[in-house]
């Protein structure tokens, strides 16, 4: 165990839409905690949305790095071991956990070490300019060091590069899990995926792994559609901007699914106005899922819910890290789950503004920050 306080760079949001790089201090881990030296972190729409959350806070919720220090009682983790982080830490005992809904754990905030008011961070375990600071999703992966519960840390298999593995904890888990755990895509099913960024491409991978017969990728960016094809999409549709009511797009999806609509239709664009479009793409009795975590108001005609259509907005792909990380690792080893092909851009910490702009403008598929 390293008993020293460490200092390192972090990207800090001020709660008013601005962010900057500064130095934070991180205490050594207490019992049941691990301090991780982050080397790479994924960038997603939720990180951009967090700019408006109450601040200040250390940004970032996808990341990978090395175990730098372990607290008393931590087993199975060694200093120097490569690890990936996750923010969904179930307690295992609350109402939701006992009914098998661990991603909805009612005590998640109590189990972290970064939530001010309920944990050691309130007393200053992580500090910025001499004052306690919160970390996004209990992690704050846009920082050289983070202090987390041991349950948030999963050892990585050999030969899995950190700047690739860093996206496993959210984008991959959410996308693949939404297809397999929540929608329960089955062999022979038809799937439509609206939006082919980091989450959408992993929905496509999950559907392919599950044995879907038809996987329809929908995006306005040709490069994203090409990548979707490479990762398992059987068809690629580029919506026409003139088709504002999506009449033509809906007709195209129905034409590819025997006139019925898809068994499962996913929204992964992050655009609130498109949140309910999957209901038009799904067949009667089918599933429509909003998996992008889109923020903002949206409206729909209630008739879209007729004919036994189900609308779901799953959290974290219904994943339980202790169960689902081993499955992801197995699929990676088998060559069934691609990671490197998902990442289109890598940026230094100083270029987060450019990473956000590329993401919001649809340039590329998934961005990763190099943390130093």
Feature roles, as predicted:
Residues 212, 271-336, 371-372:
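Glycine-rich phosphate-binding loop and adjacent beta-alpha segment
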Residues 200-201:
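N-terminal Rossmann-fold NAD(P) dinucleotide-binding loop
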């Amino acid at each position: 165990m390293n008993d020293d306080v460490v200092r390192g760079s972090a990207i800090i949001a001020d709660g008013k839409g601005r962010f900057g790089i500064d130095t934070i201090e991180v205490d050594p881990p207490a019992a049941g905690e691990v301090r991780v030296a982050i080397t790479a972190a994924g960038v997603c729409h939720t990180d951009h949305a967090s700019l408006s959350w109450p601040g200040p806070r250390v940004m970032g919720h996808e990341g990978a790095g090395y175990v730098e220090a372990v607290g008393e009682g931590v087993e199975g983790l060694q200093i120097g071991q490569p690890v990936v982080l996750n923010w969904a830490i179930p307690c295992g005992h609350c109402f939701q956990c006992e009914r098998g809904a661990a991603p909805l754990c009612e005590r998640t905030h109590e189990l972290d070490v970064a939530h001010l008011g309920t944990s050691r961070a309130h007393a200053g375990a992580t500090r910025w300019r001499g004052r306690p600071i919160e970390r996004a999703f209990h992690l704050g992966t846009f920082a050289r060091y983070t202090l987390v519960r041991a349950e948030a840390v999963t050892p990585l298999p050999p030969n899995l590069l950190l700047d690739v593995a860093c996206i496993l904890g959210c984008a991959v888990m959410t996308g693949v899990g939404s297809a397999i755990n929540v929608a329960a895509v089955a062999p022979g099913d038809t799937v439509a995926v609206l939006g082919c960024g980091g989450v959408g491409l992993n929905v496509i991978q999950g559907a392919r792994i599950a044995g879907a017969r038809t996987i329809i990728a929908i995006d306005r960016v040709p490069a994203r559609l090409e990548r979707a094809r490479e990762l398992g999409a059987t068809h690629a549709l580029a919506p026409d901007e003139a088709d504002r009511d999506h009449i033509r797009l809906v007709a195209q999806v129905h034409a590819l699914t025997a006139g019925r609509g898809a068994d499962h239709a996913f929204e992964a664009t992050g655009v609130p106005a498109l949140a309910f479009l999957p209901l038009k793409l799904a067949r009667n009795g089918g599933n429509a899922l909003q998996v992008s975590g889109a923020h903002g108001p949206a409206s729909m005609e209630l008739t879209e819910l007729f004919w036994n259509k189900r609308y779901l907005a799953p959290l974290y792909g219904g994943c339980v890290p202790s169960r689902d990380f081993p499955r992801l690792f197995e699929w990676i080893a088998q060559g069934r789950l691609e990671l490197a092909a998902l990442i289109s851009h890598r940026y230094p910490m100083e270029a987060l503004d450019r990473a956000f702009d590329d993401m919001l403008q649809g340039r590329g598929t998934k961005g990763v920050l190099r943390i130093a």
